[in-house]
Amino acid sequence: MFKLKQLHELIVPWISGINVKIPYLTGLELDSRNINFGNLFIAIQGYNTDGRLHIDDAINNGAVAILSESYNKSTFFIKKIVNNVEVIPIIYFNQLNKCISNIAGRFYDHPSLCLKLIGVTGTNGKTTITHLLTNWTSLLGERSAVMGTLGNGVLSDINPSCCTTCSAIETQKILKQFVQSGVTFVAMEISSHGLDQYRVDSLYFDVAIFSNISNDHLDYHNNINQYRMAKWRLFNELRVKNYVINVDDCVGYRWLLSLSNAVAVTIKNNLPRSWSGRWIALVKADYYLYGTKIVFKSSWGNGFIHSQLLGEVNVSNILLALGALLIMGYSLKSLLYTGSKLYPVCGRLEVLSCLNHPTVIVDYAHTPDALKKILIFAKHLCNKGRLWCIFGCGGNRDRSKRSLMGVIANRYSDYVIITNDNPRVEDPKLIIDDIICKIRNSEKLKIIEDRVYAINMVVSKACSDDFVLILGKGHEKYQNIGLNYISHSDQDIVKSIFK
């Protein structure tokens, strides 16, 4: 349990002099539909809806006070009389969204101060890196938890999440629950949306990891520079003790040179000549269908890891996780001893195989960069047969990457099947038109909107020496068509064919 708070404890010094007596607050809430009696309702203008339109609903549901984003740059206070008896304070607050993380932190006693907390950001790799960190530290005796795309919790009990980075309130609440349950270490995915919307601003990070940046979410950020600057906030504005940077990414290379207390990580011999800080560099990697041998050198010493994870991208992910744990004080010897026990993440380069059938790889790749890297890796393994690629692009999301992904798939695959991948309320045919619009040679291209039929057709038709990549959904257990969520699992479909 934690000590309940009064309103003035949460809003000083931004707001002072409010003399309305209200009960101790029982919780904080951004959604008026979830209000319980005694809650503080925080009403902000969101991306899809405006919470200020639901203040009366929140009061009717039991809210005892309201913090609201102001409609102009001023801050002011009014009293709302309910049933001629109750006085509900409504405080209009300029730039309220920037303060919610701190308000929630105060309410939940800033739980991140009681944890070893690592934040991971980048276009690709966040989920794998956070799960590696959680898995690795669990093997070393920590009670570790993860927060991100696959959900929140200890690895044996992950609760699904609706987004990569939770709201500012939910983030602090979950961290408090972790502390109360004895968790000592947390690895958190931090999305560009989460950074842009100030959801993690009042957390205290031991390490921030940067994996890479490539085209994604430009429907939200408008351009790649705004996307980069959202990511940069984690390294430039928030409370972070140490940094781990992938310097093989040109953005990471530039950022490293302006950071202190950083570890430079490279798998391409790309350390800056002027770099005098800590570092990890790949010496050699041997790639196999069911694992990778990683040989590296570092400012902590040299070593090798026999990993169960596949591909060049996971070599980088493993070394980034290694750098974070080393800079936190975990010993290289213990990390090397446990490194071979790290297991792959569901839906991330997940191999499914069966005698007399093609080798199938299921992955979440949904950006041009991720698509290209997995195709190159699979092409390296597929030296006897043909490479099939099944993928689509999400509806009502960044359109700019669709044609790029079509060209990449067509270039690196022997056969390409374009199918549905969460079309949402967008016309699937228009999504497919965007994907194929810049493909010049379409002889090896086939369009099958029905994803289940596409997978069945390809896996049944492909030869035993072939490789089939099923990309875009990864761990997901649904297909979002229109307003409906239909049960769907790429893995389950493949396994049913293998039976």
Swiss-Prot record:
PTM statement from Swiss-Prot or TrEMBL: Carboxylation is probably crucial for Mg(2+) binding and, consequently, for the gamma-phosphate positioning of ATP.
Pfam family, one: Mur_ligase_C
Class of enzymatic activity (EC top level): ligase
Main location: cytoplasm
GO cellular component, one term: cytoplasm
InterPro entries tied to this protein: Mur-like_cat_sf, Mur_ligase_C, Mur_ligase_C_dom_sf, Mur_ligase_cen, Mur_ligase_N, MurE/MurF_N, UDP-N-AcMur-Glu-dNH2Pim_ligase
Subcellular location: Cytoplasm
The protein's Enzyme Commission number: 6.3.2.13
Modified residues (N6-carboxylysine): K231
Residues the record lists as binding UDP-N-acetyl-alpha-D-muramoyl-L-alanyl-D-glutamate: L30, S32, T164, T165, S191, Q197, R199
Cofactors demanded by this protein: Mg(2+)
Biological process terms in GO annotation: cell division; cell wall organization; peptidoglycan biosynthetic process; regulation of cell shape
Keywords: ATP-binding, Cell cycle, Cell division, Cell shape, Cell wall biogenesis/degradation, Cytoplasm, Ligase, Magnesium, Nucleotide-binding, Peptidoglycan synthesis
Binding positions (ATP): G122, T123, N124, G125, K126, T127, T128
Catalytic activity field: UDP-N-acetyl-alpha-D-muramoyl-L-alanyl-D-glutamate + meso-2,6-diaminopimelate + ATP = UDP-N-acetyl-alpha-D-muramoyl-L-alanyl-gamma-D-glutamyl-meso-2,6-diaminopimelate + ADP + phosphate + H(+)
Family: Belongs to the MurCDEF family. MurE subfamily.
Entry-linked HAMAP family: MurE
Protein's UniProt name: UDP-N-acetylmuramoyl-L-alanyl-D-glutamate--2,6-diaminopimelate ligase
Organism: Blochmanniella floridana
